[in-house]
Amino acid sequence: NDQMLYEAESLEECIAGEIYKPSWDPQGSTFKWFSEQDGDETVLYANFHTQDPNREKVEINVRRRCFFPEKTGCGYITVHGFKIEKAATTWAPPAAFQDGMIGPHWSKGWIIEDCEITNSKCCGISLGKYYDPENDHYFTKKHLKSPTQMERDAVCRGQYHGWLKENIGSHIIRRCNIHNCEQTGIVGRMGAVYSVIENNHIHHINNMQELGGAEISGIKLHAAIDVVIRRNHIHDCTMGVWCDWEAQGTRITQNLLHHNERPAYCTWAVGG
């Protein structure tokens, strides 16, 4: 019924269906799911409490993205008036490939307008980084370099991958309703340069609190070079707008932001 269930760490936790204390929606957090492998099969369990899954709308999301080019460099595409929802997107850190339910994938001149974007496991819109096999999660995979050093490397290596005004950025995101995504409404590392983000309603981001850390916000950008963020209404998010490294020439103006903080009744999430 358009409500994401909370992932349990064990079948016992799923069956118990107890409140997840960091959640901004305590009662909603009692609806759980759990999965385990049985040979070649994946077995799913869910706690619907008194609701009958045979009568309600139950969806299992496995698609990683909704509208996102497989290759980089597919520029000048307009997406207008769509409802884009429910994708099993993955965590989008700045030192690795960043995906979202929709995004230009390292290209130029996209317009995403008048769309509703909702229920992404991680990010709604990604204006972010391409996949670089020579600089992707090395801290986790090879225990080499800190994530901070990987970010420094990404700035230099971006030149090898066409990070020039002629090729990348200059996107427009406008009049979209972006909500109930669990990492960011809009994320972008380097790929958002020279873009305009305006007149959007961004709300209820990261309210489940299953994810935490330094990449959570209504809008979270690295290298927001000459980006204009204006006339957006952003509320009920874990932080409103966060422009991280390389916020050169960034203009944030005429936005309305409120209630972008953890409610008093919530505990801190792990990593939050």
Across the structure, where does each feature detected by a protein language model lie?
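Extracellular polysaccharide-degrading/modifying enzymes targeting complex plant/algal/animal polysaccharides
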Residues: N1-W106, I111-S126, Y130-L164
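Small-residue (G/S/T/A) turn/hinge positions that recur once per unit in extracellular repeat modules
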Residues: C74, S107, I168-G169, A192, ...
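All-beta strand scaffolds that present successive hydrophobic residues in beta-strands
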Residues: I77-V79, W110-E113, N135-D136, I172-R174, ...
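Surface-exposed acidic, glycine/proline-enriched linker/cap segments
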Residues: Y138-G169, I173, L211-K220, I225-I229
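Active-site neighborhood of glycoside hydrolase catalytic domains
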Residues: N199, H204, M208, K220-G272
